[in-house]
Amino acid sequence: MTTTTVFDLDRFARAAEERDASTQLSMYGPEATVTIADRITQPGSPRVLTGTEEIKGWIEDVAARDMTHSVTHRVSGDSSAAFTLACRYPNGTNILCATVIEVEDGAIAKQIVVQAWDES
């Protein structure tokens, strides 16, 4: 009998909202990749993080920032998940991230993040 490990999107979302970097990181596979596209690292040359050490630095940086995080629009399936993440700094600057995740053996294998923020 084969057992399938399901990705717990609710747990991941809770960790993001609570800025719990350790729990978030524990949900990535050892060879995971995260691709980030935004105004600075545009789609033609996105930022690509490979492996949990590189991903750890990014997650810890985001979790340490003084901002609120709210996960919305969650969708999950057997081997994928997606959500939006709305963030806000105390000065009122907003960030919106759309994320698509590919899951293997219950862990994040690939993640694509597209983010935009207020500019004044």
Where is each model-derived feature located?
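Generic helix-packing signal
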Residues: 17-19, 36, 115
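A beta-strand edge to alpha-helix "cap/lid" segment located at domain peripheries
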Residues: 56-120
